[in-house]
Curated annotation (Swiss-Prot):
Enzyme class: lyase
Pathway annotation from the record: Amino-acid biosynthesis; L-tryptophan biosynthesis; L-tryptophan from chorismate: step 5/5
E.C. no: 4.2.1.20
The organism of origin for this protein: Buchnera aphidicola subsp. Schlechtendalia chinensis
Annotated GO MF terms: tryptophan synthase activity
Protein name per the record: Tryptophan synthase beta chain
């Protein structure tokens, strides 16, 4: 029996080989204890403040919105140490691993941001680290691969399947099933088997807590909308968590539309997927009629995933969050637009959320509206990808 509810409505669960159940129960037990442990909380708060650089600012876009009545604020997770929101939860998981007396960390990565965050947390806390990464992602994220290796991590190329995040996840789980006694699997998003979606949400909820306090200080009221990109869904659930009960706030999750959701080349699992079992969970998954997992597609490596975290599937089913899609070209345009007008280069993942905010602004230029966009990471890693896309 689990200590916490392992489902969000009908989504979630622990669909893993029996051999991994003791490791998941141990992790859940340690997590529950940590929530009551003042020393653990102090350690994590200290690392977030003095190592990662929290709180991150909430920045008003003054040039982007000129000539409209829209106010767009950016939650600046791009300024966090490591370059993305991923650092928030890896520090929490690394501390849990230390408490469980684990010596090694296993991780997966797509865009490389979770890999970088895992590597830096392991360097800091003296843990061995091996990271699985698809060969397609290694090719498009060479800078992050070098950063991981520089911090002492072993990067293991995954050649199976399409050589992307899905395949890296499968290999990481396979490794963990053989080495769970000494190793902790540091999952990178709010997906996978229970208790991972709950753990990752807890450690990413700092984004939403800060944002809510900051927007009240600046506007003295709640925003009209909070917008975040959704791949696995950790940055989105992190910022949404503080606003879910505020029903006047529109929560908008932006999925990767790729070349278009009418094609086979996209990653919009909530919009186009069906309920299925994948990666140890029941959620919305891109699959064939026979139940085979489809290959996802996105210009953004971090969104190139054929499923979504179970809480997002539940929030979609109860219509608390609206899920939309943005194409590769729309995301690249937003990437250029913010860079040119505000001097902020966002990650391609975050550019999907930004593109939808720009769409709302352009569709309702005279409407008084306050939008918050979670800039989940910085775009240095994507410069070559964007350059290649623009030179096509």
């Amino acid at each position: 029996m689990t200590l916490l509810n392992s489902y969000f409505g009908s989504f979630g669960g622990m669909y893993v080989p029996q051999i991994l159940m003791p490791a998941l129960y141990q992790l859940e037990s340690e997590f529950v204890l940590s929530l009551k442990n003042l020393q653990f909380k102090k350690k994590l708060a200290n690392l977030l403040k003095n190592y990662a650089g929290r709180p991150t600012p909430l920045t008003l876009c003054r040039n982007l919105t000129k000539g409209t009545n829209t106010r767009i604020y950016l939650k600046r997770e791009d300024l966090l140490h490591g370059g993305a929101h991923k650092t928030n939860q890896v520090l929490g998981q690394a501390l849990l691993a230390k408490q469980m007396k684990k010596k090694e960390i296993i991780a997966e990565t797509g865009a490389g941001q979770h890999g970088v965050a895992a590597a830096l947390s392991c360097a800091l806390l003296n843990l061995k680290c091996r990271i699985y990464m698809g060969i397609k992602d290694i090719e498009r994220q060479k800078q992050n691969v070098f950063r991981m290796k520089l911090m002492g991590a072993q990067v293991i190329p995954v050649k199976s399947g399409n050589g992307t995040l899905k395949d890296a996840c499968n290999e990481a789980l396979r490794d963990w099933s053989e080495n769970y006694i000494n190793a902790h699997y540091m999952l990178g998003t709010a997906a996978g088997p229970h208790p991972y979606p709950t753990i990752v949400k807890q450690f990413q909820s700092v984004i939403g807590k800060e944002t809510k306090q900051q927007i009240f200080e600046k506007e003295h009221c709640l925003p009209n909308s909070v917008i975040a990109c959704v791949g696995g869904g950790s940055n989105a659930i992190g910022i949404f968590s503080s606003f879910i009960e505020d029903t006047s706030v529109n929560l908008i999750g932006v999925e990767p539309g790729g070349i278009g959701i009418h094609t086979e080349k996209h990653g919009a699992s909530l919009i186009c997927g069906e309920t299925g079992i994948f990666f140890g969970m029941k959620s919305k998954v891109m699959q064939t009629h026979e139940g085979q997992i489809k290959e996802s597609w996105s210009i953004s490596a971090g969104l190139d995933f054929p499923a979504v975290g179970p809480e997002h599937a539940w929030l979609d089913s109860i219509k608390r969050v609206t899920y939309v899609s943005i194409t590769d070209s729309e995301a690249v345009h937003a990437f250029q637009h913010l860079s040119k007008l505000e001097g902020i280069i966002p990650a391609l993942e975050s550019s999907h959320a930004l593109a939808y905010a720009i769409k709302l602004m352009n569709n309702y230029p005279n409407k008084n509206q306050t939008l918050i966009v979670n800039i989940s990471g910085r775009g240095d890693k994507d410069l070559k990808t964007v350059e290649k896309f623009l030179n096509k």
